[in-house]
Amino acid sequence: MQKLAAFLKRFHSGPAADACEFLGCHTREDGEGFVFRVWAPHAQSISVVGDFNFWNTEDLPMQKISEGVWEAVSVYAKTGQAYKYCVTGPDGRIVYKTDPYANRCCALPDTSSMIDPPDGFEWHDALYRARTAKQSAIKRPVNIYEVHAGSWKRHEDGSYLNYEELAAELVPYVKDMGYTHIELLPIMEYPYDPSWGYQITCYFAPTHRYGTPKQLMQFVDTCHKAGIGVILDWVPAHFPKDENGLFEFDGTCCYELSDPMMNEHPDWMTRIYDYGKPEVQSFLISNVCYWLRYFHVDGIRVDAVASMLYLDYNRRQFKPNKFGGRENLEAIEFLRRLNEAAFQANPAVMMIAEESTAFPLITKPDYDGGLGFLFKWNMGWMNDMLQYMSLDPLWRKGDHNALTFSMTYALSLIHIS
């Protein structure tokens, strides 16, 4: 109880990098059943429904144990069973929600969470991790193969390769081609099959499309034994408005900003996180630490950083910050805390910003006024190179500046091209 009380204090004052160790579904200390905890500060009531209670909304009501954290215990719940939270909002409307901290999700169209604790996998990558821990990635050769697991290769019937099949075919290919890392486009659970996975509905659950969480761990283990690092694309800039997801989780704007002028992304029609809330910071930061700890990933590429940094990003109207500027001060502070927590979890981690503007000091440490990333994705060089190669060869001689322009800013930050 003392550990829980200490966590709740950290969670509400923020950020708590270990939030995933307390929230979600966890095995009870005595090993009998599971405890469920969820953050929903404005909910009238919540109950846990699932296979273990025949989805009876009155069988397992949750109790509020702090400012917005609810808890329930079931001795009947078992690994592999599905569950959801039945949330009654302040207006009395009832919505069935996926657990934000769920470690696994059921196969679509079922949007239920599944009980599946992430521990218990036997790793064989100690030598690889010891070797990479000795030297920063800045001083090591890096050659990254970016891949979408669902479209790199498929079976003849169009079905996806699972993680075991990907490991058997992708890892030897990457090794033979001289790459040092595989970067996976988002493999967290997402709702729309034809997409690349950038609208995430469950951040702690690997998508069901390619196998189980343990099979993803096996994929990473196979990569490491072959000397290949694994980087994950990660999306803290926005989330979709699927009713079962984070969208208005407790019947109000819970994870997202409450201001209707600012809480929706104009390009993607998705919701934007409220980075000023300690509980939201804890959710996102603990998610990165979760992937580093339980899945042994070597790097995190943070997607759409520019959309986080600017309040007027692709907006005609916006509300300036307290100094009258366009910078999102809460997002800037969040990114600093994120990088600090990530490097505490794994000092050798590659924290990469996918940032498309000239925002200063992205790869400088916090104490130098920077954001604390290790690398910035060199989108400028990429766009210039693609533009140059798209020209008719006859006209390229007049556009050689596209090849050299990136050299004017190359030394201001640490780039990955």
Outline where the language-model segments fall.
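Substrate-binding/active-site clefts of carbohydrate-active enzymes
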Residues: 126-141, 148-327
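Conserved alpha/beta catalytic core and glycan-binding cleft of carbohydrate-active enzymes
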Residues: 296-298, 313-417
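Short, acidic Ser/Thr/Gly-rich low-complexity loop/linker segments typical of extracellular
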Residues: 57-67, 376, 384
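The feature marks proteins involved in alpha-glucan
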Residues: 1-35, 63-146, 151-158, 165
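Short proline/glycine-enriched turn/loop motifs at strand-loop junctions of beta-rich domains
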Residues: 39-46
